[in-house]
């Protein structure tokens, strides 16, 4: 990553998955304030959890600068006229631009700090920050049905999305984050629902009795969106065959994409809408396959002794996160589909699975049963920085996360 600084500008190129090296430098007025230790902890936490910064003397090992790491910038912390001022400066301490936050009753709103750091991230990288964005997931309540719930990146503002008497599964945010797709399961069968988050839901597809028509599907489940939000790729079953179909939301017409006698599920479409990855049991166990939509060419992507599932394209279309089961445990892997290079992100004598990307591609949310019950966790894309997302009681099970840029 090439970076140069002057007192007037910051030039950044080749960001990739790197993080900016930052030193927090409290000024005298900040240090003299009785709340300064607490404020500094909050600032450190949000810079770390943004996924964009490494900080000198951070409380978080995964975000702490070590050794003689070269600084990229400084952030000067000051207090003036009931304002917390975070001034971005070059490595010599020359101020570049200030970020200001109102203080009331010796406190400030953390949501405003998150917004400020998101704006700083966008100024530096051109990509909006993810602090305060929304993660939807399946929540299993004790002795009750599964619902679709949502929470923000700090584990706050927990709430229900689905409000129907059926079991709700597989949430998938629309590209504009204004609606969410999920599958419901009831005594009447399965259905794919589009929830527009304002009390309005639309049933896009519903399973029907197989004998009533050769066209009807005996099972339907949600999948992946095209980037224009007008079409989906979904899993549909007719007879004894389960395949992937392209589905037009407006016309309600479907087009079959896979025509193999195997069971094919879990579609994930690349950001450019040209490349599809999915799960198939063509070899007798689940593996990940790739299909080029323009030519129809498909081939196997994952190899190894165990099964592979849950593929998810990164937001820039360069990597695929997925789950591999080996020696009885599921772990999250990262695959470069073009070079074939594969990296293991999680390890342990427990399961970690169902990865989903952050909108900026710097973090992954996933489900793990490391405590005995499946809960949601976050980590950076290099596998470091693992932390529990929610504070939901132990007997609630959390799974199938999906991350949106929608702020909560």
Predicted regions and their residues:
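C-terminal/domain-edge helix-coil "capping" segments
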Residues: 2-20, 96-160
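Multi-bladed beta-propeller domains
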Residues: 152-167, 196-221, 247-263, 291-309, ...
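Residue-level detector of Asp-centered blade-edge/turn motifs that repeat once per structural unit
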Residues: 129-131, 175-176, 227-228, 271-272, ...
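Amphipathic beta-strand/beta-sheet edge segments enriched in Tyr/Trp
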Residues: 64-119
